Design a protein with these regions (language model features):
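A generic structural motif
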Residues: 30, 91-95, 269
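Short, small/polar residue-rich loop motifs at catalytic or cofactor-binding pockets
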Residues: 262-263
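Structural motif
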Residues: 55-57
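PDZ/PDZ-like peptide-tail recognition elements
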Residues: 2-40
Length: 310
């Protein structure tokens, strides 16, 4: 599972998403069962500002029907992206809402920052939200915690909700900030049962801190590595919903025609030997059905909470 082929026309946008800004509507999505389902609206982007929510299903873009068309990811991206300040009308199906919703999105620069929030909650408790583990994430994180430490932070809330993962090495660097030298962060095991152990190596700036890690059903892969390492080493309290359950390691290999493949090469385990990977025994459909059902329950729970709050 999670092995994939990336066509040449998709590869540039995939790599772009792990680097700089781009012009578009600013959503991460799953293309499954003829349905384009929003994982998250990127904070600071046009869809986030317009009120698009996780679990929303995009049915139409202007007069183009997207639902049921078997569009590839690259075609969806091509349709949703466009020139700066151009408009696109999205028709959305939202769980818990009977009627369809229309949103006018003005395409603009989508900020792809990893650390999207960093501030003091009280005189000793800092807060950092990381939305992905990309090339620049650790440098952004370092800068944020240096600022928090200068403001008096001795404890930290690490928000990994809706963080779908990224580079394993970056997750290891983040976890290292909370763990003492020589502490096991994770280990991987491949098909031949070869084991590779990853240990903390540097002096972490929050080794003595109380750490609270926020997760939800969209916290996956690298997010689960960090959360699992802190939990198993009794360095962090996990708060939130059950995470996605992706405990596999992929390696990307570029091909001669400009495309690439990502192959699952090993399974990772938390320090106590737990595998985060959800069962794939019933196949891809059941695997993702479980995820979508959880998204729908989340949307209903949110709607009910909003009604109670009113």
């Amino acid at each position: 599972p999670h092995s994939s082929y990336i066509p040449k026309q998709d590869l540039a946008s995939v790599k772009e998403n792990m680097k700089g800004d781009f012009i578009g509507i600013g959503v991460s999505f799953y293309n499954y069962k003829d349905s384009i389902t929003v994982i998250r609206a990127i904070e600071g982007g046009p869809s986030f500002r317009a009120g698009i929510l996780p679990g929303d299903r995009i049915l139409m873009a202007d007069d183009d029907t997207i639902y049921g068309q078997n569009w590839s990811d690259s075609k969806v991206i091509e349709r949703l992206r466009g020139k700066k300040n151009s408009k696109v009308q999205l028709t959305i199906k939202r769980t818990g809402v009977d009627s369809l919703l229309d949103f006018e999105i003005i395409r603009s620069e989508v900020p792809i920052k990893s650390v999207v929030a960093s501030y003091m909650i009280n005189p000793t408790l800092g807060y950092v939200k990381i939305n992905r583990f990309a090339e620049s994430t650790f440098l952004e994180f370092e800068k944020s915690i240096e600022n928090l430490l200068s403001e008096g932070a001795s404890n930290l809330v690490l928000d990994l909700r809706d963080n779908s993962g990224g580079f394993l090495q970056i997750a290891e660097q983040i976890a290292d900030e909370f763990l003492e030298d020589g502490t096991l962060i994770l280990f991987t095991k491949n098909k031949t049962n070869e084991i590779e152990k990853i240990f903390a190596t540097a002096k972490g700036r929050f080794e003595k801190a109380e750490v609270y890690v926020l997760i939800n059903e969209n916290s996956a892969s690298a997010s689960e590595i960090v959360a699992g390492a802190l939990q198993d080493n009794d360095k962090g309290i996990i708060i939130g919903r059950r995470s996605f359950g992706k405990g596999l390691v992929q390696q990307e290999m570029d091909l001669g025609d400009g495309s690439a493949i990502r192959l699952t090469t090993s399974r990772y385990y938390t320090p106590t030997g737990r595998s985060i990977q959800r069962s794939y025994d019933k196949g891809s459909e059941a695997y993702y059905d479980d995820y979508y059902q959880r998204l729908e329950h989340r949307a209903v729970d949110t709607l009910q909470s909003d009604l109670l709050a009113d």
